[in-house]
């Protein structure tokens, strides 16, 4: 039977999805299932790894059944995943010894402080590109080994395996035959040397983590094993995987140095490909691993802001100013400007490039003439201002002045936000026709790995732009508006 499709498994923080793409990179079928969020203590976040697998395997079966696609027609399955989330399971039984500790979980803060006290902060920064923060997997692994009864003894005997979610899914898909990760996910563990592309012995020793626990690191664009859908039909190759933000970067075909994308979700993630050079940030960004045009390792600068779409949710759920996120464009467009109002959504502090956990949200510039439309417009503009903060930091670090920014995520449907993003950055903003770029990136990697597509050049002919947003304000206005934003941010940090 002819191979007509590639399936992307998109395992996210709140739901598992499966998306079928055809040879023209069009979406054929989508299936999605949410799963339980667990909050056992303040600041702790967990998932049940078996529920993640149950939700992911069920949507894989469902997405094919819904479109009437036979497993023989599927060329490959690609994987993209929430990064950093940590699972440890028994090699012999496949049973997790503890819930997955989610990237948002802060329980390992004390371990990070211990590493800082040991003088490891600069070593971590130089060799992993990351900050010493509970966000990343390494300290989560140590917490499990230290706190789950018998875990450390089992680990020392080589009876346990660790994986981020990509590794866990491949292990389950291949029925325990393959224990593997890719460089983009390995680079988020705090244990991976991004220069030698190997696990870092000094950090493993500092965290007391046995090497036997860790998966083999294989290229993002390669075949890892095979699986059968529900144990039936012919075997399908499991091929191609990347962490969610790197998958989106590849899905946008940002495979050359200086190309960048911004994902507008709950927060915003801006990544710029820096090619074969790992650029160290001096402006609050992370250095991470990306995927090059032939599936090889490239590097990227990454900046994240905590409050993107979450700011709009706040307008809806807490203030009641809108009924639906899509209402914001209508209200923002009813006024010519914000009437001097700036909203700084530092509800949980500020992310990159400030990294200020003590900053708090505020609305500045309120006068008697300020109304709902001005506040809604200021909320939308805050998303673009924060993205400009990241873009300016990237320009300083990389020496590359960006001319075009590719965008994806739910908020890119908002034309007002996209136009203001172009205006305030003085950069052309490109919105793709297929906004599911994270899943598309996983599909591209899988398809390239098995020869479903020949090269990135072929893929470029399939990537269509829905709309170009061209900067449309003068330099003087741009400088004045951004100066107002910078002043507002400074006051939230005072």
UniProtKB/Swiss-Prot annotation:
GO terms for biological process: glycerol catabolic process; glycerol metabolic process; glycerol-3-phosphate metabolic process. It comes from Shewanella baltica (strain OS195). It holds the Pfam family FGGY_N. PROSITE patterns: FGGY_KINASES_1 (PS00933), FGGY_KINASES_2 (PS00445). Pathway: Polyol metabolism; glycerol degradation via glycerol kinase pathway; sn-glycerol 3-phosphate from glycerol: step 1/1. Its EC number is 2.7.1.30. The lineage of its organism: Bacteria, Pseudomonadati, Pseudomonadota, Gammaproteobacteria, Alteromonadales. ATP binds at residues 13-15, 266, 309, 313, 410. Sn-glycerol 3-phosphate binds at residues 13, 83-84, 135, 244. GO terms for molecular function: ATP binding; glycerol kinase activity. It comes from the Bacteria. It catalyses: glycerol + ATP = sn-glycerol 3-phosphate + ADP + H(+). The keyword Transferase applies. This is Glycerol kinase. HAMAP family: Glycerol_kin (MF_00186). Key enzyme in the regulation of glycerol uptake and metabolism. Catalyzes the phosphorylation of glycerol to yield sn-glycerol 3-phosphate. Glycerol binds at residues 83-84, 135, 244-245. ADP binds at residues 13, 17, 266, 309, 410, 414. The gene is glpK. Inhibited by fructose 1,6-bisphosphate (FBP). Keywords: ATP-binding, Glycerol metabolism, Kinase, Nucleotide-binding, Transferase. Disulfide bonds: none annotated. The keyword ATP-binding applies.
């Amino acid at each position: 039977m002819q191979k007509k499709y590639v399936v992307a498994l998109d395992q996210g923080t709140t739901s598992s999805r499966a998306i079928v793409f055809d040879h023209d990179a069009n979406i054929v079928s989508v299936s999605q299932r949410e799963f339980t969020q667990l909050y056992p203590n303040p600041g702790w976040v967990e998932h049940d790894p078996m529920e993640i697998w149950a939700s992911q395997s069920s949507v894989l079966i469902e997405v094919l059944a819904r479109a009437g696609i036979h497993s023989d027609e599927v060329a490959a399955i690609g994987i993209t995943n929430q990064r950093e989330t940590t699972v440890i399971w028994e090699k012999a039984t496949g049973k997790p010894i503890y819930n997955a500790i989610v990237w948002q979980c802060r329980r390992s803060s004390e371990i990070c402080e211990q590493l800082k006290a040991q003088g490891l902060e600069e070593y971590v920064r130089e060799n992993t590109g990351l900050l010493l923060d509970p966000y990343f997997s390494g300290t989560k692994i140590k917490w499990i080994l230290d706190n789950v009864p018998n875990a450390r003894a089992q680990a020392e005997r080589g009876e346990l395996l660790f994986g981020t979610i990509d590794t866990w899914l491949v292990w389950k898909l291949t029925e325990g035959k393959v224990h593997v990760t890719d460089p983009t996910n390995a680079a988020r563990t705090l244990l991976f040397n991004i220069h030698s592309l190997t696990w870092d012995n000094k950090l493993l020793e500092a965290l007391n983590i046995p090497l036997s626990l860790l998966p083999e690191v294989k290229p993002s664009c390669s075949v890892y094993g095979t699986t059968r859908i529900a144990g039936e039909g012919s075997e399908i190759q499991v091929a191609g995987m990347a962490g969610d933000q790197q998958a989106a970067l590849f899905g946008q075909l940002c495979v050359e140095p200086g190309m960048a994308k911004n994902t507008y979700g709950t927060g915003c993630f801006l990544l710029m490909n820096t090619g074969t050079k790992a650029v160290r940030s001096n402006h609050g960004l992370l250095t991470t691993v990306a995927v090059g045009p032939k599936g090889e390792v490239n590097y990227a600068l990454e900046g994240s802001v905590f409050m993107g779409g979450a700011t709009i949710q706040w307008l809806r759920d807490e203030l009641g100013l809108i009924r639906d996120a899509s209402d914001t464009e209508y209200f923002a467009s009813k006024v010519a400007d914000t009437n001097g109002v700036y909203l700084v959504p530092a509800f949980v502090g500020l992310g990159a490039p400030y990294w200020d956990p003590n900053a708090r949200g505020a609305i500045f510039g309120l006068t008697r003439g300020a109304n709902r439309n001005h506040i809604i417009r200021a909320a939308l503009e805050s998303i673009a201002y924060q993205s400009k903060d990241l873009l300016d930091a990237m320009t300083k670090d990389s020496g590359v002045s960006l001319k075009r920014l590719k965008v994806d995520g739910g908020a890119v449907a908002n034309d007002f936000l996209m136009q203001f993003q172009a205006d305030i950055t003085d950069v052309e903003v490109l919105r793709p026709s297929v906004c599911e770029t994270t899943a598309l990136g996983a599909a591209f990697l899988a398809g390239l790995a098995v020869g479903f597509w020949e090269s990135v050049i072929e893929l470029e002919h399939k990537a269509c732009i829905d709309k170009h947003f061209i900067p449309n304000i003068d330099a003087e206005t741009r400088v004045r508006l951004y100066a107002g934003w910078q002043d507002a941010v400074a006051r939230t940090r005072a």
